[in-house]
Design a protein with these regions (language model features):
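Generic secondary-structure signature for well-ordered alpha-helical cores
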Residues: 101, 131-134, 179, 196, ...
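Short, positively charged and aromatic/hydrophobic N-terminal segments
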Residues: 5-16
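N-terminal Rossmann-like or analogous alpha/beta NTP/dinucleotide-binding catalytic cores
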Residues: 19-138, 149-150, 162, 226
Length: 274
């Protein structure tokens, strides 16, 4: 998956079309495993072809992406390999760079979410939304493993999806139907680390008021007839079912810190910051 923004520039003095500015924003791979042919065929090769085409036309192209280094995908891999999240992301980030070089994928910038600039930008966005009233605190129920004595965010739990009955849904989304959810909504909750039943505890988190954007998003979407039908229908389905406010912090120690007092032991949810 990649997004492209095209900005044509016209010369008012000579009346001809000047080179366009093309921004190609390519999906960020999680730095928790090796790339495979599906990654390349799915987004990186198409994006590279698009970039090369516009460079040949003489346009100014900026193709960017980076390693998604935070969240439970990385910490679970570290648990599996008996190492640290830092070592995991460094290993796989370097492997990504080697892959792009071997395949000739022509990124202008391939960065990572572990930079100080990314942290500062995330904090700036978080604080702006907080100041404007789009972020609020609320106590929610969170899975907790008594055996491992730890909270279990997102991919640390599995259970039955309430939307499609998939038996192996994750704690933040069902990969079978794409339905986003809180982990406590799953049926038959089980810890992925020890495969034991888990309990539910209260934990305070920050929520993003997605519901406040629903009306404006529907208006914005109303004239997007040029989108592919499946993309348009998928987006409309979420809006028609009603946007729900989502927790954007997690009980985890790996990730970007939350710029709020009382949240020192939590981190910003990877989908918010990446």
């Amino acid at each position: 998956m990649f997004c492209a923004t095209i900005a044509p520039l016209y010369s008012t003095d000579f009346g001809y079309l000047m080179p366009e500015k093309i921004l190609i924003a390519v999906a960020w791979p999680y730095a928790n495993g090796w790339l495979h042919i599906g990654h390349i065929a799915g987004c990186y090769l198409p994006a590279d072809i698009f970039a090369r085409y516009h460079r040949l036309k003489g346009n100014s192209v900026l193709m960017v992406s980076g390693s998604d280094q935070h969240g439970t995908p990385v910490t679970i891999r570290a648990d599996q390999e008996g190492t640290t999240p830092e070592e995991v992301v460094e290993k796989y980030h370097l492997s990504f760079l080697e892959t792009w070089d071997n395949l000739g994928i022509s990124f202008d910038l391939f960065t990572k979410t572990g930079t100080s600039n990314h942290r500062e930008t995330t904090h700036e966005i978080f604080n702006t939304l907080l100041r404007k009233g789009y972020i609020y605190k609320k106590i929610m129920t969170v899975p907790y493993c008594e055996h491992d004595a730890r909270f279990l965010p997102d991919r640390y739990v599995k259970g039955i999806c309430p939307n499609c009955d998939n038996q192996d849904a994750r704690g933040d989304q069902c990969d079978n139907c794409g339905h986003p959810m809180n982990a406590s909504e799953l049926g038959n909750l089980t810890c992925r680390l020890c495969n034991q039943q888990i309990s539910i505890r209260d934990s305070e988190h920050c929520f993003l008021s997605l519901s406040k954007f629903e009306s404006d998003l529907k208006t914005w979407l109303s004239d997007k007839d040029g989108w592919r039908p499946n993309v348009l229908n998928f987006t409309r389905k979420f809006l028609d079912s009603g946007l729900k406010d989502r927790a954007i912090t997690r009980d985890i120690q790996w990730g970007i810190d939350v710029p709020m007092q009382g949240f020192e032991n939590k981190r910003i949810y990877v989908w918010f910051e990446a």
